Amino acid sequence: MKKRLSWLSFLLLLAAFTNIQCAKHALPPTAVSMPVIQGAVCVGCDRCADCHEEACNAFAKTIHGRIAPFETAGLGTGCETCHGGGSLHVESEDPGDIITFAKLTAAQQSRICLDCHTRFHWAGSEHYLNDVSCLQCHKIHPPVGNKLLAKSEPDGCYSCHMDIQAKAQYPSHHPIREGKMGCSDCHDPHGSMVGSLLKTDERLNDLCLNCHASKQGPFVFEHAPVLEDCTICHAPHGTIANNLLKQNEPFICLQCHEFHFHSAKVGYDQSTDGDSPSTYYVPGAYPEAHNLSQRSSFKRAWTTKCTQCHFKIHGSDLPSQAVPGQGKALTR
């Protein structure tokens, strides 16, 4: 009985904690309170064009202006689909008698768009939670470029993500500034099931492996970070080190691995007299190894890249040679 009560108490606490966490977030789009113009009814786009001729002519050339009534599931087409019934506004010419987007919050603006654009994970996404509205990226009235974007990729994204723009200028970067790919190749700005608006519903690595399929395996000899998370070693937006590595070699490898019989130990371990399998046990191969002040010893240590030997760093099907008992050294 006591055990059951303990479990019940735990579940109640868990439920309470979950409710507190959910309460911290904004309401989902379907629960956003919208303004209502009482007594207003639809009068048709022709009446709008009497005053807003330029805007209506431009709108007619956009994808929204060419939508057929059957495509909007009873929501109607034209100006009043978004702005609501215009009868009172036509009579009074008062901006307060019609829904004006400039007076709406970001959540309210997006709520109107989501009446038709339902196939997104917008609720709970980073953009939604940071009060980004659809209109910060899209222009509705003028017939602008692809997908009604106010700015094309990546410039539109860089308007807010200036830190990412800076990283894209690093020597090692994905070919975004060369025009070979864009932010939306990896990110879905309208929301996703995982963090950072990534275009994957499962592992982060699955997104990387869409392009880097040769690194996927499975391999007989695996490298654990490849299975776990590519960003353990790589920074996808740009780095100073080659191959989008977070640090240069050997320092990035030394975050997890200690250096061993190669030249690093020549200046570190007095019991070591060599830096390769052939000279490891040869006395006197490196006389300066026993003098820790010798610059040449440490020069060899820190200018050696791990991938000079372990070049199959993402995994291999072949056992390593010349390394007794070390089949997983990923050297070939």
Q: What do these predicted ranges mean?
A:
Residues 4-5, 19-332:
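Short sequence/structural segments immediately N-terminal
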Residues 1-10:
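Bacterial N-terminal signal peptides that target proteins for export
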